[in-house]
Amino acid sequence: MSRRICSVAALFVLPALAIAQEPLPFLHAKDMIVFQGDSITDGGRQRTGSDYNHIMGQDYAYILAAEIGAESPERNLTFINRGISGEGVPQLTARWQRDTLALHPALLSILVGINDLPSAAPTRETAADYEAAYGKLLAETVAALPATKIVLGEPFMLPVGRFKANYAADMVELKKRQEIVDRLGARYHLPVIHYQKLFDAACSRAPADHWSWDGIHPTYAGHGLMAKEWLRVVDQQWGSR
């Protein structure tokens, strides 16, 4: 009898726990969350919007949309992925009005920078170019969307595949961009997700190729790691999980 009473009591306790642990409690019903960036965010997403199995891609953004959507269905939040493979800040800027500002998201997540390295950018842009362009983009965004919460993701790299041979040299340039993201976060009072530190620490638990299959694109385990850290940082900044 006592076991049965405990089981019945649990039915009333569990929903209360679920409500207390609701992710992103600062968001309201029908709010929109937009993910912007390059191929890491793109995740091979389907473009037309007719295939809802693949509309978010296969990445950290998908994991977050799945978890938050399942844990908080009552709010009917909308998740939109606008990441495009191969893009850097100049390409984001060209489509920013259509793919970001016009959407008026409640929460905007940006991860860009790996394609802004001299070895990747066709224009061979410098760190100063990256800072000026990214800073201008954020200034325009903050002015146009004063109520939108913005989180910045730090670009990252691991010594895997073709990035292994020149890893030290590439990291010199990448670190400049990582420091720029930190400065821009401080300037506009935006939280920054330090993915490089996250992956460096994870490499003490498993080899780098467990987390990234080519040095810049995460494996499913890497995307899972990113999603957990994203949620931790965002909830720490604006709410509690």
Predicted regions and their residues:
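Alpha-helical cap/lid subdomain in secreted, periplasmic
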Residues: 3, 27, 59, 63-78, ...
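Short glycine-rich His-centered loop
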Residues: 23-54
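Intrinsic low-complexity/disordered segments
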Residues: 18-19, 33, 220
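Conserved active-site regions of diverse hydrolases
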Residues: 84
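Hydrophobic h-region of N-terminal signal peptides that target proteins for export
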Residues: 11-19
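Bacterial N-terminal signal peptides that target proteins for export
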Residues: 1-9
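Hydrophobic alpha-helical membrane context
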Residues: 15-16, 50, 206, 231
